[in-house]
Curated annotation (Swiss-Prot):
PANTHER family, alphabetized: V-TYPE ATP SYNTHASE SUBUNIT D
Function, in words: Subunit of the V1 complex of vacuolar(H+)-ATPase (V-ATPase), a multisubunit enzyme composed of a peripheral complex (V1) that hydrolyzes ATP and a membrane integral complex (V0) that translocates protons. V-ATPase is responsible for acidifying and maintaining the pH of intracellular compartments and in some cell types, is targeted to the plasma membrane, where it is responsible for acidifying the extracellular environment.
Keywords: Hydrogen ion transport, Ion transport, Transport
Family matches, as InterPro entries: V_ATPase_D
Annotated Pfam families: ATP-synt_D
Assembly and oligomerization: V-ATPase is a heteromultimeric enzyme made up of two complexes: the ATP-hydrolytic V1 complex and the proton translocation V0 complex. The V1 complex consists of three catalytic AB heterodimers that form a heterohexamer, three peripheral stalks each consisting of EG heterodimers, one central rotor including subunits D and F, and the regulatory subunits C and H. The proton translocation complex V0 consists of the proton transport subunit a, a ring of proteolipid subunits c9c'', rotary subunit d, subunits e and f, and the accessory subunits VhaAC45 and ATP6AP2.
Alphabetized NCBIfam families for the sequence: V_ATPase_subD (TIGR00309)
Protein known as: V-type proton ATPase subunit D
GO molecular function term, any single one: proton-transporting ATPase activity, rotational mechanism
Source organism superkingdom: Eukaryota
Gene3D superfamilies: 1.10.287.3240
Length: 246
């Protein structure tokens, strides 16, 4: 395992616990981001279907509005100056609010009517019915345009956030988690190797002490066979063992 495949860390019990915690955190974060991406995808597909539906309806509404404009001009004549003289402010205005989807803020635009709604225009003696129809059709067109602008803004915002979220999910799934798993496996293998080395070292020390003890017992037996008083001899078994290092 090359150093690029894992994190550079000294193998120890503390490092093992640290890697386990980081791995658990990465897996939890991956799960949360995956759920967020799924929720955004659901809203994204819903907005896409609404955009298609609204654009289809927009074609019909704009066609009707254009026909109403031509009809009103044919009936009334040029009424632009009369409208400009009698209209002091716009009745249809736009307000915005915010919607939250899985932590993503989406701007929502909606149109509303400010003030009284009247179809009577001073100075127009004929064509009132056509003008009322014209105004109503263009109000519907403005409402749809505002709705479409809101949907497309949310569409672009969600598209960018989904791309970023998917990149993060892929990075955690294919880079971060595998690297943490390889690092944890490396630490475990190194600790196992250290345990085997320690076991082997302790076994060699025990074998060495057994050999020394057997030699001391043999020497003691030889002295006893020669009739030598062992009480006057130094007790070899009481001598301190020298340090055995490997």
């Amino acid at each position: 395992m090359s150093g690029k495949d894992r994190l550079a860390i000294f193998p120890s019990r503390g490092a093992q616990m640290l890697m386990k915690g980081r791995l658990a955190g990465a897996q939890k974060g991956h799960g949360l981001l995956k759920k967020k991406a799924d929720a955004l995808q659901v809203r994204f597909r819903l907005i896409l279907s609404k955009i298609i539906e609204t654009k289809t309806l927009m074609g019909e509404v704009m066609k009707e509005a254009a026909f109403s404009l031509a009809e009103a001009k044919f009936t009334t004549g040029d009424f632009n100056q009369v409208v400009l003289q009698n209209v002091t402010k716009a009745q249809i205005k736009i307000r915005s609010k915010k919607d939250n989807v899985a932590g993503v803020t989406l701007p929502i635009f909606e149109s509303y009517q400010d003030g009284s709604d009247t179809y009577e225009l001073a100075g127009l003696a004929r064509g009132g019915q056509q003008l009322a129809k014209l105004k109503k059709n263009f109000q519907s067109a403005v409402k749809l345009l505002v709705e479409l602008a809101s949907l497309q803004t949310s569409f672009v915002t969600l598209d960018e956030v989904i791309k970023i979220t998917n990149r993060r999910v892929n990075a955690i799934e294919h880079v971060i988690i595998p690297r943490l798993e390889r690092t944890l496996a490396y630490i475990i293998s190194e600790l196992d190797e250290l345990e085997r080395e320690e076991f082997y070292r302790l076994k060699k020390i025990q074998d060495k002490k057994k050999i020394i003890k057997d030699k001391a017992e043999a020497k003691k037996a030889a002295l006893r066979a020669a009739g030598q008083d062992l009480r006057d001899s130094a007790n070899l078994l009481d001598e301190g063992d020298e340090d055995l290092l490997f």
